[in-house]
Amino acid sequence: MSAMSSRINQSLAFLNNLRKIPLDEQSVDCLFSSKSFKAELLTQIEKAKYRIYLTALYLESDEAGSDILMALYAAKKANPALNIIVCIDYHRAQRGLIGEKKATSTNASWYQEIEKAQGLGVKIIGIPVKRKELFGVQHLKGFIFDEQILYSGASFNNIYLHQEERYRYDRYWLIHNVKLADSMVSFLNKEIISSGAVARLNTDVITPMSELKAAHKKLTRNLKQARFEYEGERTSDCLAVTPLCGLGTRNNKLNKTIRKLLQSAQQEIVIFTPYFNLPTAIERDIGALLKRGVKLSIVVGDKTANDFYIPKDKPFRTIGALPYLYETNLKRFATKHQKMLQSGQLKLNLWLHDQNSFHLKGLYVDNRFMMLTGHNLNPRAWRLDVENGLLIDDPKQQLKPLIDKESQQIFANTLLITDPSQLQGVNNYPDHVKKIIVRMRRTKADRIVKGII
């Protein structure tokens, strides 16, 4: 047996031996637009009988965020026994938007106002994954309503929920399964909500970070070792799901599983990522799978579909150079693998639809495995943020109609790149962007930026 075959077999054995929760084909569904995502959220909130757990990066104090929060309060008022917990990032909730000089109010101050007026006990929990937001955030995903999971990388604001003209496109999968829902709720209760390092964000006084320091070390240590608890089966012949999580580079089960998916591939992989900024390990695995003849399609947002992109008619800020930096990464990658790009073995698909933005993440592997995750496949997700994912094993391709429909929807707004020259380079960029990138390269600051953003 060759070393290549051995690596493939070892990786497949790892994936086959993961403990899985069997799924009924009828219990899985997919939504195909941000508008239907918002409608589904509101429906599920209204229908929930005993628990609602929402995990996201943030809940914004805008019209769409208000629709969600007020729906939660209405549900609690109608059913006081309903347990409602929203888990978001502690730091993100207490600052203004990027670029705001001084925030007069924050999301947290809005939560406090609403709770003061309503007084119903909807709990909004802030999770400080690291002491500073720059070095790691709460990036767990998933919304649980009784026994129903709605999994998406989206947060709650006008653009994610398509409140106005613009939308931010994500993935939206529904799974009805008691074991999976219980496991996800148990994880949140045991690892996060019961921790002394988290703080209620809608009480009169929010515990400052200085008072959370001692408990915070324990939280970080625990999250690095945390696992979902459930009774699973080591099966490889039926539709099933494995919940995964990870924080940091050591013993990170989610990162390890992503690598095993790439290393196990024999026919075809599709990767979705909003920012083309791959960790070294992923780049290496991609190089190896291309070398062994696996077809690879990467769907990535055009620089103008990046949530950091600043339109030309708006005042420019340094953070607006990021989408250009990611495009230089993509151009370098396309140049490195030019032969495979031109032969069609490698397909780079740039997503662009009007003024909308792209936030999809995940993988399809060999028409069998599908990874749903908030993991951006970038160094930040690899090393700094706490992440989770749902690995769906579909050996009989029972979800193929849904996956095909989702793919069709995604690829409808993509441009196929067949040559690196189709991508702009530094020389094509506006002068103010060019200066920033050249200066960053000269001081090697671009490496630091790529590692943390």
Each language-model region and where it sits:
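C-terminal, well-structured subdomains that either form a transmembrane helix-short loop-helix hairpin
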Residues: 265, 271-286, 359-374
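HKD-type phospholipase D/PLD-like phosphodiesterase module
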Residues: 11-13, 17-47, 62-265, 304-363, ...
